[in-house]
Amino acid sequence: MEKKTVTVKILGKTREYPMGITYAEIVKEYEGATKYPIVLVMKDGKLRELHKRLKQDGTLEFITTADEIGHKTYKRSAILLLLKALYNVAGHDKIKKAVIHYAVSSGYYVTVDGDVAITEDFLLKVKEYMLELVEKKIPVMKRSVGTDEAISLFHKHKMYDKENLFRYRRVSRVNIYSIEEFEDYFYGFMVHHTGYIKYFDLYPYDDGFVLQLPERKDPEIVPAFEPHQKIFQIGRAHV
């Protein structure tokens, strides 16, 4: 007889769930049980995104934005959200490429190559659109595609730098993440939906701007941007 339930140990207690339930559904039951939002789970020592399904008995641990891998997941997801908003506000045809260069302060230095003026007004529109997406709790979708399909995908979206990158990469599969119609390649985990990405700010800086994010020690507070010019110049020299 086919097994219809799965038994797992969570926070020291044994629970039983229907076979194939998503981790997101389980996590919903534990809202408020952790100080910070649960963005991933650890199933028997292996990290899993929340859209994945529980299929075997075992032990389940929660990963929040205060954990190292959870914090990295939050930052990576914030970058995807930012890129979606950038292309939407500026218009796809106006951007040749948007580049996340390196960490500066507690965020990332970003430049945009194209017919786009990075002004405070423009960044305000981008931020407002990002907050709209957060409010809607749009699913962050993941799919694995072959390299040839990824090349065609980036060509269609006019992301020619990434198209060229994958022409010379010897990998068989590529993880593509999307928010609505916007798609991009990322290596690493993402949050389940845009509603998790509540904390960020945008600051115009030098030839681009900074996506300012919380630090791991306080994952729901966005610190004020305090540029360290020496560190910035060292980072810029490697761009």
Task: List the model feature ranges, each with a label.
Residues 52-55, 59-73, 85, 94-105, ...:
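Auxiliary tRNA-acceptor-end handling modules of aminoacyl-tRNA synthetases
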Residues 1-79, 84-104, 128-129:
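Ubiquitin-like/PB1-type beta-grasp interaction modules and other compact soluble beta-rich domains
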